[in-house]
Amino acid sequence: MSETPAQCSIKQERISYTPPESPVPSYASSTPLHVPVPRALRMEEDSIRLPAHLRLQPMFWSRDDVAQWLKWAENEFSLRPIDSNTFEMNGKALLLLTKEDFRYRSPHSGDVLYELLQHILKQRKPRILFSPFFHPGNSIHTQQEVILHQNHEEDNGVQRTSRPSAENVHQNPPTIELLHRSRSPITTNHRPSPDPEQRPLRSPLDNMIRRLSPAERAQGPRLHQENNHQEPYPLSVSPMENNHCPPSSEPHPRPSSPRQEGTRVIQLMPSPIMHPLILNPRHSVDFKQPRLSEDGLHREGKPINLSHREDLAYMNHIMVSVSPPEEHAVPIGRIADCRLLWDYVYQLLSDSRYENFIRWEDKESKIFRIVDPNGLARLWGNHKNRTNMTYEKMSRALRHYYKLNIIRKEPGQRLLFRFMKTPDEIMSGRTDRLEHLESQELDEQIYQEDEC
């Protein structure tokens, strides 16, 4: 009995399995292409063979996608029938399940489903983070994880050198060759148009690699004439801890760099947090530039300061994968359970964050100074939900305390005041009268503003 072409194809696949070509090869598998792969390693590649609508991140799967993934896994791995009713959830909920949860919902196949999901997550993660940089067919602007915003033309270009073959991918990591052309604010020379086949990748990150120091800029035209040529130096890009990139199905020949011995390594570390760094003249962000010594070891380099105006002209907005910075926000002045102005002033004096607005001159004598009257008025306005509060309006409320001998202005001193009573002594008095006076003062201010 002769075999049909379909049966021959299935038989051939069982004998020798060849992973399908993909524009983004799997990072998890280190087995060379076109080599028979054992059954134990097939799970590393099987997620690529998922149906097209399941090739998204599992967190974006709908409930129907989860059910179809269970059905696909049951057929692909010859598992026992899986009750899809025990997995009535979307992809986000599926990722919350532990291995024990999978075993509880599917006693016979739960461990396989859990491991398969972990392999899918492992393969999808580097595909999003690194594919725009290492595969020329992909566009950076289509990836939501990496945003490179550029408003000015850059003089630094990135050219990819020749890709390694599948045999020497571990020995010779691919490099990115950065070509630096010096800039002069006075003279501009004509630059030849780049080779369209090279397709340089331009980004604001290029300027962070090499930047002329202020001393070098001060040398003027002499430095411009000496450095008016491109200086290539290679950078070895390592997206994984194995320090290599996966091979591509189609090699792209490029002229190799003449300085291969001085390769610099950039370790791309994925981070769960993509925190935006908005670079503007009010913020100074220092990026550490690692340098390689002659023996190949990393040494900490000097920070590259990005607070200069000319640097900011080339780097406006960069999405950098870093941990969130510590919060140093200016306090807005809202204090709970604080209705009266004297109590509010006492609370501010007890908080060191407000020393730029008000502070003690002599705490024993209860003498305080208003450092920033307009800023203090804004804090009081924020506390009272009065955005148009001014120091003149706030000082009217202070005058009521003069009459009640609670606060006194120091004679001959500007913006220097003294508390005549302690908070306990003030609270034991007629606080209801104080609240009435301050409320009346605010009502009069609102009425006057409405009349205007």
UniProtKB/Swiss-Prot annotation:
Stretches assigned to the PNT domain: 40-124
Cell compartments where the protein resides: Nucleus
Signal peptide segment: none
InterPro entries linked: Ets_dom (IPR000418), ETS_fam (IPR046328), Pointed_dom (IPR003118), SAM/pointed_sf (IPR013761), WH-like_DNA-bd_sf (IPR036388), WH_DNA-bd_sf (IPR036390)
Domain of life, source organism: Eukaryota
A GO CC annotation given for this chain: nucleus
Stretches for region Disordered: 154-262
Phosphoserine modifications at: 22, 213, 238, 257, 323
Keyword DNA-binding found: yes
GO terms assigned for molecular function: DNA-binding transcription factor activity, RNA polymerase II-specific; sequence-specific DNA binding
Start-end of DNA-binding region: 339-420
GO biological process: cell differentiation; hematopoietic stem cell proliferation; regulation of transcription by RNA polymerase II
Residues the record lists as Phosphothreonine modifications: 18
Crosslink site: Glycyl lysine isopeptide (Lys-Gly) (interchain with G-Cter in SUMO2): 11, 288, 302, 403, 421
Keywords linked to the UniProt accession: Acetylation, DNA-binding, Isopeptide bond, Nucleus, Phosphoprotein, Repressor, Transcription, Transcription regulation, Ubl conjugation
Polar residues: compositionally biased ranges: 158-174
Similarity comment: Belongs to the ETS family.
Protein name: Transcription factor ETV6
Organism per entry: Bos taurus (Bovine)
The gene coding this protein: ETV6
